[in-house]
A protein has these predicted regions:
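Short, low-complexity intrinsically disordered segments enriched in A/P/G/S/L with frequent Arg
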Residues: 10, 14-15
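Residue-level detector of intrinsically disordered terminal segments
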Residues: 17-19, 27
Length: 153
């Protein structure tokens, strides 16, 4: 036989035993926890209203017909967009998925969890509302154009 096995070892002969250090075990635990978190919550971000919309009056004030008045004010003075909307506290986290953390070129779909994570960091540590936007192009000019269209000056 020539194989040295401790007495009482019930594993089948030829079974693989993995020995990991605590750092590797920790990484595996974070990986499993991250998959569970993302699956259970379908990502890490959501849009939540700052104002109640529980009654008909609430709805009429937050949406139509009441919303027309701030629209008119912004139409008359474009700078009022910062007074009447969240625009002054919004940023876009834009990626084409080609240089994602230590993952490299993983594409826009696979980049979304990282961009959501960055959005969470903006909110938690800076109080800034951030939206992840993953573009399906690697053309620099197209990316610039898309960002300009998203946020006109």
């Amino acid at each position: 036989m020539g194989k040295c096995r401790p007495s009482g070892d019930r594993r089948p002969q030829g079974s693989l035993v993995m020995i990991m250090n605590s750092q590797e075990e920790s990484a595996m635990n974070f990986n499993e926890a991250a998959l569970k978190l993302h699956e259970e919550h379908h990502g890490k971000i959501e849009v939540v209203s700052k104002v109640p919309v529980k009654t008909r009056d609430d709805l009429s004030t937050a949406y139509t017909p009441g919303v027309a008045e701030p629209c008119r004010k912004i139409h008359d003075n474009k700078k009022d967009v910062y007074k009447y909307t969240a625009k002054g506290n919004l940023v876009a986290v834009v990626s084409d998925g080609t240089a994602v953390l230590g993952l490299g070129n993983i594409g826009p779909e696979a980049a979304m969890p990282v961009m959501e994570g960055k959005s969470v960091l903006f909110k938690e540590f800076g109080g800034v509302d951030a939206f992840p936007i993953c573009l399906d192009t690697t053309d620099t000019e197209e990316i610039i154009k898309a960002v300009k269209y998203i946020a006109p000056c």
